[in-house]
């Protein structure tokens, strides 16, 4: 056995028999579930970390990726790579597809490209690892050797894949110099993963769904062409289902270890299987799963549906004459039925995002709330007070600090501050206690924290989140409209509805934003939101108006839905954007919503007391 460290990349097998890596973020999520052990239920819901993967669940025991809406199953595996290779450095190589978006290369190809890039080669020929492409680093382009078609490529930095250290068989270690790995291929076994791999390969090689170029890649020659439009992907497979090492020009940085059970330390990443998946693969995979595996998948999917707020409505056999009584509807029913669990058939409810049309004469102002709109402009800089003067209002000096750590710099309070950034004007050994919550810090650290924030005259305790002063945000300029419409929300039949319309245009980021001077986008505006016109609903509206004036409703950042950066996003105060249903979790009925949003506003320092200090 050899003590070694490696980065772990989780991968899934696509319909062409190529292993595709999950992204680093997804891999880290899988590892967290694995480390949680049996209490996590043995399944990983990928949509929790990447909304684009919402249909997918991984069953860790059978090592399969399950697509909920189609029932397609794909094998997954845990692969090891040299920490000095691309995944160990957070480097991702991507090619531009016909739609203008970027697609990551398969892990082996990306490692090969990065190795040549680090050696400062002007270009690299990928023919030796089975792809008829040249990567030209001077132009950052990919050239098809046969058609001479060129595509752009790029190198970007992402999270580093998870690192593991432990004992590994010597035959699974990587060689110290470039060249093919020396371990012999493992013989095929009868575990579900290997059966699935072999079934996919058999379908592709023997007249399956893959194009001719892909089937050629599966031959023993190991040299083939990558089909267009997909860019260079994983290395060729031989007929035993084992991935072949790269040729002489590529670094052999792979630890060829394929595990059927997922130990701790894995990471997840790129998009899951394409929608045009090989259905035969899914059927073969389903047949290999035993009752316990099916039960786990069914229960995992039920958890996802319940968490998303999808209601269940019993449905009968619609035509009454079918011999199936009733027909199985939905993959959850198929799974639960196959696992011997009771099945209740449901009809999916209709998504209702907007109310029925409302005429101008039907729109009314809200009693007790003046005006029907509110605008915000750019931040007005506060003058005349230094950070030290601001903090002086909230702090009491501590002459004899306790033998504890400052939770900002993690140095002892009895020692000088460990902050190493721009030097505040206070002494690094001064210690202060926040007046209301009583938490103690180096004053030096608090000044540095204030300078790194919004510098609006307020301070938030980093331990308990108590807010001192009036907290403001970085919301870009926009308009908030609010009025009554003559329709009721589900769960609130006795009152009308307050409609809020937010409008924010795209623009240029200011000094308080993540990238000053850079443009930002504003997707999905105007955004329509809904509250019941009840006493508590009007209370929430008044507090939302305070939050709007303090620029706390929106911020500029990275969208958790699309992954787009430098765009307008919600800022921790949830809104209901679904009028007549609750399929997305952002609609009605929701008995706890008004209380929850009041708590979220209070966490931003906005409560009923705030309304007495702000305009209506």
From Swiss-Prot:
<keyword id="KW-0914">Notch signaling pathway</keyword>
<dbReference type="InterPro" id="IPR001841">
    <property type="entry name" value="Znf_RING"/>
</dbReference>
<dbReference type="GO" id="GO:0043161">
    <property type="term" value="P:proteasome-mediated ubiquitin-dependent protein catabolic process"/>
</dbReference>
<dbReference type="GO" id="GO:0008270">
    <property type="term" value="F:zinc ion binding"/>
</dbReference>
<dbReference type="Pfam" id="PF18102">
    <property type="entry name" value="DTC"/>
</dbReference>
<feature type="compositionally biased region" description="Basic residues">
    <location>
        <begin position="375"/>
        <end position="384"/>
    </location>
</feature>
<dbReference type="InterPro" id="IPR039399">
    <property type="entry name" value="Deltex_C_sf"/>
</dbReference>
<comment type="subunit">
    <text>Interacts with NLRP4.</text>
</comment>
<dbReference type="GO" id="GO:0061630">
    <property type="term" value="F:ubiquitin protein ligase activity"/>
</dbReference>
<dbReference type="GO" id="GO:0005813">
    <property type="term" value="C:centrosome"/>
</dbReference>
<dbReference type="GO" id="GO:0005737">
    <property type="term" value="C:cytoplasm"/>
</dbReference>
<dbReference type="InterPro" id="IPR018957">
    <property type="entry name" value="Znf_C3HC4_RING-type"/>
</dbReference>
<keyword id="KW-0963">Cytoplasm</keyword>
<dbReference type="InterPro" id="IPR039396">
    <property type="entry name" value="Deltex_C"/>
</dbReference>
<comment type="similarity">
    <text>Belongs to the Deltex family.</text>
</comment>
<keyword id="KW-0862">Zinc</keyword>
<keyword id="KW-0677">Repeat</keyword>
<dbReference type="InterPro" id="IPR039398">
    <property type="entry name" value="Deltex_fam"/>
</dbReference>
<keyword id="KW-0833">Ubl conjugation pathway</keyword>
<feature type="region of interest" description="Disordered">
    <location>
        <begin position="223"/>
        <end position="254"/>
    </location>
</feature>
<keyword id="KW-0863">Zinc-finger</keyword>
<feature type="domain" description="WWE 1">
    <location>
        <begin position="1"/>
        <end position="78"/>
    </location>
</feature>
<dbReference type="Pfam" id="PF00097">
    <property type="entry name" value="zf-C3HC4"/>
</dbReference>
<feature type="zinc finger region" description="RING-type; atypical">
    <location>
        <begin position="406"/>
        <end position="465"/>
    </location>
</feature>
<dbReference type="InterPro" id="IPR013083">
    <property type="entry name" value="Znf_RING/FYVE/PHD"/>
</dbReference>
<dbReference type="InterPro" id="IPR004170">
    <property type="entry name" value="WWE_dom"/>
</dbReference>
<dbReference type="GO" id="GO:0070936">
    <property type="term" value="P:protein K48-linked ubiquitination"/>
</dbReference>
<dbReference type="GO" id="GO:0007219">
    <property type="term" value="P:Notch signaling pathway"/>
</dbReference>
<feature type="region of interest" description="Disordered">
    <location>
        <begin position="355"/>
        <end position="387"/>
    </location>
</feature>
<protein>
    <recommendedName>
        <fullName>E3 ubiquitin-protein ligase DTX4</fullName>
        <ecNumber>2.3.2.27</ecNumber>
    </recommendedName>
</protein>
<keyword id="KW-0479">Metal-binding</keyword>
<keyword id="KW-0808">Transferase</keyword>
<dbReference type="InterPro" id="IPR018123">
    <property type="entry name" value="WWE-dom_subgr"/>
</dbReference>
<feature type="domain" description="WWE 2">
    <location>
        <begin position="79"/>
        <end position="155"/>
    </location>
</feature>
<dbReference type="GO" id="GO:0045824">
    <property type="term" value="P:negative regulation of innate immune response"/>
</dbReference>
<comment type="pathway">
    <text>Protein modification; protein ubiquitination.</text>
</comment>
<dbReference type="InterPro" id="IPR037197">
    <property type="entry name" value="WWE_dom_sf"/>
</dbReference>
<comment type="function">
    <text>Functions as a ubiquitin ligase protein in vivo, mediating 'Lys48'-linked polyubiquitination and promoting degradation of TBK1, targeting to TBK1 requires interaction with NLRP4. Regulator of Notch signaling, a signaling pathway involved in cell-cell communications that regulates a broad spectrum of cell-fate determinations.</text>
</comment>
<dbReference type="Pfam" id="PF02825">
    <property type="entry name" value="WWE"/>
</dbReference>
